[in-house]
Amino acid sequence: LIKDATRINLIETTEMIEMGEEPVRAIRKKKDSSIVRAAVAVKEGQADAFFSAGNTGAILAAGLFIVGRIKGIDRPGLTSILPIAKPGSGAKNFVYLDSGANAESKEKNLLQFAQLGRFYAENVLGVNNPRIALLNNGTEEDKGDRLHKEVHQQLKAQRDLNFVGNVEASALLAGEADVIVSDGWTANAALKATEGTAKMMLTLIKNGIENGGLRAKLGYLFLKPVFKKIAKLMGTSTYGGAVLLGLKAPVVKTHGSADALAVENTIAQIYTMIESKVIEKTVSYFGQVRSEE
């Protein structure tokens, strides 16, 4: 995508938003920070998108208050692309939102997240008629609190959504849906629990190899290619960054520890978003919904 320096324009800034700063106050005070300057460039049409590995809250605030929401969207959803770990499932990854932008959500927010996820899965991931699921504490239709029961019924009633029902956190990576929708608090907690379990299992395997004697070490040598394949599948660098869907342009957050591969894949991710016109299609859809209300 970027073969030489002719497509790179460096803009010097004089301020920096630190990781621990309060997001809204920081973007209002530090107008010459890279996050604010990038968001302003997108708003003014000097850039098509922006991504950063900086302060997550500041990126979200800049996206919301500077780039701006799509009309008809009440709250943007932070969208992660996660791997599907179940063999033979067909798909390699799925859309997961809201993964932490909104601690509390209403029914209409989750319905909007489902539509945002559908457009992303169709246009960026190339999934035809994506399966939409609701993250819940059981697969039965009557499971969950009042919010989840009501959202389940409303998703079921949406004719333009391929709603397949509830999915439990234990099946998060099992490939049961192409888009999994949740409120930000629940989704973030489930995601961190999954990440924590994966790290714990890796630690146990590593300790078992190191303390298991010669047989364990020989076994590791035979299985090393398998471990590398799993690491690539589950690695955060493989799938790009987390997109704040529901804004007027692509705004993407990458990990603070992002390596060159993560940056490359994030740029490719943004390129696909722009080329597929997923934002324009989303704007058109919600504009039509508003006109029919």
Which residues make up each language-model segment?
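Glycine-rich phosphate/diphosphate-binding loop of Rossmann-like nucleotide-binding domains
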Residues: L1, R7, A103-A169, D178-V179, ...
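Short glycine-rich anion-binding loops that position phosphate/pyrophosphate groups of nucleotides
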Residues: E15-M16, N55-G57, N137-E140, W185-N188, ...
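Short glycine/serine/threonine-rich phosphate/pyrophosphate-binding segments
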Residues: D32-G45, A49-G63, R75-T79, K106-E107, ...
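Phosphate/nucleotide-donor binding subsite
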Residues: K3-A47
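Glycine-rich phosphate/nucleotide-binding loop
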Residues: V67-K92, Y96, E176-I180, G184-E292
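Metallocofactor- and cofactor-centric catalytic cores in central/energy metabolism, strongly enriched
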Residues: A5-V24, N162, V167, M234, ...
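Solvent-exposed alpha-helices and their adjacent loops that cap or buttress functional pockets
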Residues: I2-K3, I27, K31, A41-G45, ...
